[in-house]
Amino acid sequence: HLILQGKGGVGKSMIAALIAQYQLTKGKRPLCLDTDPVNASFQAYKGLPVTRLNILQDEEIDPRSFDQLVELISHAKGDVVIDNGASSFVPLSAYLITNQVSAVLQDMGHQIMVHTVITGGQAQSDTLHGFTQLVKQFPSDVSFVVWLNPYWGPIERDGKPFEQMKAYTVHKDRISAMIRLPDLKKETFGRDLSDM
């Protein structure tokens, strides 16, 4: 479970935490990795067994450090949940695509599932563009889980929901699941979620 989106602050770490928590409730012990070199948000969730993977070398992202990531995945017996920060989005995506990591991992018995976020509000265009670019760049055997996060506003354009937007209609065959995060009242549960 690879959480990828080039836009920061859209809920990637929260989604990684939700996936990890779900796995734990099913009695599984996922390998949880935080590759964000700036904010270790996933690792900050207490109670989750998250390991932070240092991908910086002399304050620059070292693409070769992703070899260690693939090595960890290759030895994993169960699910792997990887939170990737906006600052390392481009280098990690380039590494995965250039080195055909999905094919390598599939040969080892693993399946890559890319989770991405579409958000409402000001970042909506950026997240839609990010999703479209991911789908175009990753091989066709990689499927996507799209998380719709209304925290910053409704996910609609010109009165149309995501399912009627071009980003969805053109690429719907690559989407294996769509998860709608609830639009919680800001005064109650929304505040709790935001504090997390």
Model segments located where?
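Nucleotide-state-sensitive switch-loop elements of NTP-binding domains
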Residues: 2, 16, 25-89, 95
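Short glycine-rich or small-residue beta-strand-to-loop segments that form or flank ligand, phosphate
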Residues: 2-4, 81, 114-118
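Amphipathic, alpha-helical segments enriched in basic
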Residues: 5, 17, 106-109
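Walker A (P-loop) phosphate-binding loop of P-loop NTPases
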Residues: 8-9
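Conserved lysine of the Walker
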Residues: 12
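C-terminal boundary of histidine-terminating zinc-finger modules
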Residues: 196
